[in-house]
């Protein structure tokens, strides 16, 4: 039987590439885009529970992200989306307490989690917080059938950020292939993606 996959943020650059990769690999994929859920309020959105209850996925992939330069308006959206959306998924399984089948939760972070950046202070901070969420959740679920993956790519060519055509960066398909590889392993994983060799 094909495994069932839910992809949050499936209309974005990495999300849409991930949808195509999993669909072509034979998974039963349920894509969730921003028009179905307001990702800013996803941290307290009952629709997340409803989707996970209805689909009963084997793999949950969260590609939702918010990227903005540092200004006084960025705080709530940046943390609500980059941290809160992932927490809402983890919280769903904490509330269930037990799973009778293996479940893999995969979150998309950023290489920015390693160091602050002056123009993206809160973005980098939110990705560092996501790393800690991943660590804590791995510890929480260590005696269960639930495992978690966190993938931290370097700069990736998506519409979310303004990148010059000539800039060195990953392609969304590169990240999607790494997510596919991560989904095949039932263990906790942290992957820091770098630029291809030679760049």
Roles of regions detected by a PLM:
Residues 67-70, 104-142, 155:
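Catalytic loop of short-chain dehydrogenase/reductase
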């Amino acid at each position: 039987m094909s495994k069932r996959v839910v992809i949050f943020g499936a209309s974005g650059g990495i999300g849409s590439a991930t949808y195509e990769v999993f669909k072509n690999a034979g998974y039963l994929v349920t894509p969730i885009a921003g028009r179905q859920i307001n990702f800013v309020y996803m941290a307290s959105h009952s629709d997340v529970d409803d989707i996970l209850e209805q689909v009963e996925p084997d793999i949950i992939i969260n590609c939702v992200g918010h990227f903005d330069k540092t200004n006084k308006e960025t705080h709530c959206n940046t943390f609500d989306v980059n941290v809160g959306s992932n927490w809402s998924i983890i919280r769903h399984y904490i509330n269930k307490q037990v799973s009778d089948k293996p479940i893999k939760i995969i979150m998309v972070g950023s290489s920015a989690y390693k160091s602050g950046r002056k123009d993206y202070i809160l973005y980098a901070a939110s990705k560092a917080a996501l790393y800690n969420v991943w660590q804590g959740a791995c510890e929480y679920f260590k005696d269960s059938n639930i495992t978690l993956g966190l993938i931290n790519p370097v700069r990736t060519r998506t519409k979310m950020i303004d990148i010059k055509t000539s800039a060195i960066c990953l392609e969304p398909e590169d990240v999607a292939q790494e997510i596919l590889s991560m989904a095949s392993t039932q263990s906790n994983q942290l992957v820091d993606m770098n630029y291809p060799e030679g760049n």
